Amino acid sequence: MNSKAIISVFLIMLVVVSCTQATYETEDDDEPGPRHSEKRSCARGCGGDSDCPCPGWHCPSPGGRCEP
C-alpha cells in the first residue's frame, strides 16, 4: 500500500469512530430536561447568576457551579 492509501484508511476509521461515539452520547438520554452533554456545559463554574448560560439555571454561591 502506498502512503495515500494508508492515510485515507486512517481518516475513514477516525470518522467512523467519532460518529459512533456521538451516537452513543445522544442515545442514552432517558431523563427529561437537557441532554447529558448540555447539562455538562450548563454546570459550569460561576460567580453569579449571570454566569450561567442555560435558562432557568442559577448560581448557588460565588465560586460554585451553576445548578438547575
Swiss-Prot record:
The keyword Signal applies. Residues 24-50 are annotated as: Disordered. Residues 23-40 form a propeptide. Residues 1-22 form the signal peptide. Disulfide bonds join 42-54, 46-59, 52-66. Keywords: Cleavage on pair of basic residues, Disulfide bond, Knottin, Signal, Toxin. Residues 32-41 have a biased composition (Basic and acidic residues). The presence of a 'disulfide through disulfide knot' structurally defines this protein as a knottin. Exists in two forms, due to cis-trans isomerization which probably occurs at Pro-68. Stable protein with probable toxin activity. Does not show activity on all channels tested. Shows no hemolytic activity on rat erythrocytes. This is U-actitoxin-Avt1. The lineage of its organism: Eukaryota, Metazoa, Cnidaria, Anthozoa, Hexacorallia.
